[in-house]
Amino acid sequence: LRMCDGLPTMQEVGAVAALAQCLVHSLDTQLDRGYTLPRPTPWLLRENKWRAARHGLDAELIIDDAGAVRPVREAIAELVEDLAPVARRLGCTTELDDVRTLAAGPGPAGRQRAAVAAAGGDIGAAVDLLVAEFAAGHPLPPGSGVADAVHAGAAAG
C-alpha cells in the first residue's frame, strides 16, 4: 500500500490505519470469493502516482484507459462509504469516519505548506507545526491560536 506520510496526530494515524485495514480486509475477502483485481496499465499507475505526489488531496486521478478523471476527495468519500460495513465488522467505524474529515481539509501536508508560507518560506515552521499538532493531539490549521503562535515564532526566529 502506498499511503500518505507525515501524519502528526493520533486521530489522523488512526484514520489512515483504519482505511488500510478495511481495504486489505475487503480485498482479501473478494479474492477469497474468486474476484480478480483489475490490473491498471503501467502508464496509468505512473501518471496517478505523479498526480497524487504533486497535488495530494487536490489531485484528479485517471480512472480508466480512456483518460476519464475523478477528484481524489470524491473517490475517498465513496471508498469510505463502500468500506463502512467492513469497518463495523472490524470495530473501527469511528476511525474510518475520520478519513472523511481528513480528506475534507487541507491534510497534514497542506497545513505544513501553509505554515511554511506564513513563515516566509522557513521550512522550520513545518517542523514546529508538527510538534505543536502532536502535542495538541489534533490538527491546528492556520487561524487557530497555537498554529498562529507557531507560525509567528517561525517568522520571528
Regions inferred by a protein language model and the residue ranges of each:
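C-terminal accessory/tail domains of diverse enzymes
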Residues: R2-G157
